Amino acid sequence: MQAQEANALLLSRMEALEWFKKFTVWLRVYAIFIFQLAFSFGLGSVFWLGFPQNRNFCVENYSFFLTVLVPIVCMFITYTLGNEHPSNATVLFIYLLANSLTAAIFQMCSESRVLVGSYVMTLALFISFTGLAFLGGRDRRRWKCISCVYVVMLLSFLTLALLSDADWLQKIVVTLCAFSISFFLGILAYDSLMVIFFCPPNQCIRHAVCLYLDSMAIFLTLLLMLSGPRWISLSDGAPLDNGTLTAASTTGKS
């Protein structure tokens, strides 16, 4: 009897030690991720405050929309290399600078309310799907239920968007962006599962980069969905809003 109790106590200690090791890995991964996200959002805020005269940069340069592919290309590289992908500070800062500059220019062209909304929605989606990854775990039945609920919510959103009074171009942009965000959220859930259950201590940087790339792809797609139709309408000669007029007049006076 005492031997069984000793074995049970030893097992519980081993489980506690194993859980603590996983917890330290999670702390490292999410600390690196928060640093990357804070750097990108901070740099974007500096661009937005420092270059108010360039609000129409994205309106005058349609080709810049292609830079939304930067995080997608980075994601393709990380998944293609897999465990052979380097996991060091050099790789971290290469991905960080490439995606931060892209996001900064997108933010420079956006309105303040769009930026705040995109920030909040990106963080909310990240927290929600990280929680779903913990909730779903490795149980396929749970993931089937989660997928069904998400599909119903997505179809409801698309139905409301298509029945709105917006023009056909805005409806197309919203639909494409909604499907793109859903795809990136699926990848985010997968990466979160990898961090929770399969992340070794020597791969913390690589997994943090994967989470960062997923979040930046979602953030840029949200900016494109919320600001894209306005940029296109401005390029077609639509009148500027009060905020743009104020910025333009201030720049002209200076």
From Swiss-Prot:
One of its GO terms (cellular component) is host cell membrane. This is Membrane protein US20. Keywords: Host membrane, Membrane, Transmembrane, Transmembrane helix. The keyword rRNA processing does not apply. It is a multi-pass membrane protein. It comes from Human cytomegalovirus (strain Merlin) (HHV-5). InterPro entries: Bax_inhibitor_1-related. Disulfide bonds: none annotated. The chain crosses the membrane at residues 31-51, 62-82, 89-109, 114-134, 143-163, 178-198, 208-228. The gene is US20. It comes from the Viruses. It is found in: Host membrane.
